[in-house]
A protein has these predicted regions:
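Conserved residues at the C-terminal ends of beta-strands
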Residues: 8, 65, 153
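Active-site phosphate-binding/coordination module
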Residues: 17, 21-122
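Asp-based phosphoryl-transfer active-site loop
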Residues: 2-17
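Conserved acidic, metal-coordinating active-site core of Asp-based
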Residues: 101-163
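A short alpha-helix capping/helix-coil boundary motif
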Residues: 5-8, 28-30, 70-72, 140-143
Length: 163
């Protein structure tokens, strides 16, 4: 008998349309009724994971940002492993725009998702299923935060590889 089940989101709990199927919803409900603990683990940030949890119709603990942050079923942060400031500062000091004018930096800080440029058009065109978007802040504000995950986004794969 299983004591717990941990599931990823994309391609596991969520189908190709990034939705929870009725079968998945019923399966998770059955696990919980049997007393089996259920957890969601994902590379997404808290808000992205919570959106999927809400669609499932359950309240379960969330492990986010590739395991660097965990939240209880009520959304309280219970664990966080931020990037070390010395390494974070080195990455944030990179002149990433010199690798490609369309490259942007983005990061997860606690339950928040921050970017330094407006991405509404990107999400509207490329990820129309998303209902939650990152908060835009200035590069100066970005450098003041602690992050559990930072990453670069861009259209040109070769530019990102060079970076």
């Amino acid at each position: 008998m299983f004591k717990a089940v941990v599931s990823d989101l994309d391609g596991t709990l969520l189908n190709a349309e990034h939705k929870v199927s009725e079968f998945t919803r019923e399966t998770v409900e059955l696990l919980l009724k049997k007393g089996i603990k259920f957890y969601i683990a994902t590379g997404r940030n808290y808000l992205g994971a919570k959106e999927a949890m809400d669609e499932l119709g359950v309240k379960v603990p969330l492990i986010t940002s590739h395991g660097s942050v965990a939240f209880d079923e009520n959304g309280n942060e219970i664990f966080s492993n931020n990037l070390k400031r010395e390494y974070l500062d080195k990455v944030l000091d990179i002149d990433y725009k010199s690798f490609g004018k369309d490259i942007i930096i983005t990061g997860y800080s606690g339950p928040n998702w921050f970017v330094t440029e407006d991405l509404r058009e990107y999400f509207y065109n490329k990820k129309p299923d998303r209902t939650r978007y990152p908060k835009q802040i200035t590069p100066e504000e970005f450098k003041k935060h602690n992050f559990t995950k930072i990453f670069f986004l861009g259209e040109d794969h070769d530019e990102l590889l060079e970076l």
